[in-house]
Structures are given as C-alpha cells and as structure tokens.
C-alpha cells in the first residue's frame, strides 16, 4: 500500500457481508457496491430465503444483471440454513461453486429471519457435513430468547452457542459476523485459525450514545444493536492491531426511508456508498493506516482460501458531503452519514 499525504492506493477490497435485497431495491443498490468491491458475500435472507441451488443461481443472475457495464464484480452466494434443509443440497451447491458459505440466523434475530434455525442441535447433520467438506459457516451471533436483554445477546451467544459448537466441530470454519462487543473481539482474537470475524463501519465509528442521546437516530439502528463505548473501543483496537482474522464486512442493509423513519422502524444501515471511506477514517484515527489494506483486501480472501484481487483503487483525503438521500422507484434511501461531511472517499 502506498500512502502519499492525500491518497491511499490499496488492492481492490471485498465486502464479506452484504445485503442487496431484490427487485427495484437490488437494481438501485448494486452499483454502489460493484463500482468499489471485487466480490461480496451476499446474504440469503430474502422472502422466501435462498435455500436451494436453483434459487441461488437465479438470484446471482439478477444481481449480475444489475451490475453496470464496466464494473468487474463477482457476487458470492450463500445458503440460508433452516431446520429442514437437506445437507445433500448444500453440498451440491458448494461443490458446483454456487454456494461459497452458509448462513446461520437464529430464528427471528434480524430482518427476514423467521425461517431461521431454532437450535444448533436441529441442524447438526448439516453442520457436520459443512465441517467435512470445508464449507464456511457464517453466524449472526445473538441469542433471541425474550428474557435476554438486547444488549446482552451477543455475549450470551458466545457462551451458550458458539463455544459449545466450536468445541463439538473443531474443524468447522466459522465467521462471527458483525461483532459488536469486547466479548466477541476477545473471543475471536483468542481463537484458532478456523475462527474469524467481520466488523461494520457503524460499529467502529459509533456507540449507543450516538444513536440515542439528543434524539433517536433511526439510520444508526441496526442489529446487532450499537453497544456502549467500551465495546466500540475494543473493536477499534482489534482492527488497529493488524489482527489478520478480522476483515471488512459492511452489513450494508438498505430499507426505504418510510420503513426506517417509523413508529416501528426496521434495522439496518445502508452504508455501501460510504463504508470504505468510513473504515479509512477509523484506521487513520487509530494511527493504523498500515493495516488498512489487509483489513479491506487481504484478510478475507486468506480466510476463505481465495486469491486476492489483482486490481487497485484509490481513496482521496478531501472533504466531501454525503448525499441526503438516494432515489428509489417510489421512495428514497438514506445512506449512512447522509448530509455529513466525510474525510475519505473513493477516487472516481
């Protein structure tokens, strides 16, 4: 990576956690990712979810159809795990290069997760098959029991689900997605080479005070929810350390404005347009720009056993204002940091 005073040149990054939705929303949001990233792990939580090879092939084609000419972008598809999923279907998709990984959503943990897994025991034959064939498991790491406080769901998941699972299936490759707590940062750092994590820009930049003090900011509301400052600091320190099993995963999750600015608003930040510059700002603030390229472009491919991208992009350090909104067919999208002045942006 070369870093003259105002330009960062890095190998083209990948996004290891992305929601593209479907239909008109998909057509609107895909270009914001495809112009910057070489690849992205695409989440399968559509309605209905992506649970078959055929559904994944069709969804992949809809994504590719939305990629503008001149963008070199490869969507990496995932399978949505359910209690009733056939392990043979999962293995077929993996062997045919359709499924890159499989996603475990605890039932009702987040958007469109009502079909999710009721317990790890219910899908143990599937997980055993994944361990056998070397297929990565992507985990939304929260318990969803009604009696557990929303701010404690990730920490409880580690002790009650994640650690027992990894003790039982010691060769299974696991990505602990969008980690938000010191508990998770410590757990991944202290784990072995088969455990990795992604972190979003919002969890590095903000904590729950930013979302709740002085008024509720619905466009910072996502799941897992922003935590207190000590957790934010632990995440920042983890990425700034150069730890090589944590990598870029935006969890960009678009919802129309009326679904966010509501009496019962949806969870998710549409950060695809601003995420890379946001990460750069955090690394700069932590005096860790020497580790920025690895986080964005190297650590993820290494964990997945994929080649790094062979093209490069540049970020420029000059103040720019983020758009207030982005047009949808019959509504608008509010991007992460809408209307704010940002320090780093991708050079056009």
Swiss-Prot record:
Homodimer. This is Dihydroorotase. Belongs to the metallo-dependent hydrolases superfamily. DHOase family. Class II DHOase subfamily. SUPFAM superfamilies: Metallo-dependent hydrolases. One of its GO terms (biological process) is 'de novo' UMP biosynthetic process. Keywords: Hydrolase, Metal-binding, Pyrimidine biosynthesis, Zinc. CDD domains: DHOase (cd01294). It catalyses: (S)-dihydroorotate + H2O = N-carbamoyl-L-aspartate + H(+). One of its GO terms (molecular function) is dihydroorotase activity. Substrate binds at residues 19-21, 45, 140, 223, 255, 267. GO terms for cellular component: cytosol. Pathway: Pyrimidine metabolism; UMP biosynthesis via de novo pathway; (S)-dihydroorotate from bicarbonate: step 3/3. The keyword Chloroplast does not apply. PANTHER family: DIHYDROOROTASE (PTHR43137:SF1). InterPro entries: Amidohydro-rel, DHOdimr, Dihydroorotase_CS, Metal_Hydrolase. The active site is at 251. It comes from Escherichia coli O6:K15:H31 (strain 536 / UPEC). Catalyzes the reversible cyclization of carbamoyl aspartate to dihydroorotate. It holds the Pfam family Amidohydro_1. HAMAP family: PyrC_classII (MF_00219). Zn(2+) 1 binds at residues 17, 19, 103, 251. The keyword Zinc applies. Zn(2+) 2 binds at residues 103, 140, 178. Its EC number is 3.5.2.3. The modification N6-carboxylysine is found at residue 103. Its cofactor is Zn(2+). Binds 2 Zn(2+) ions per subunit.
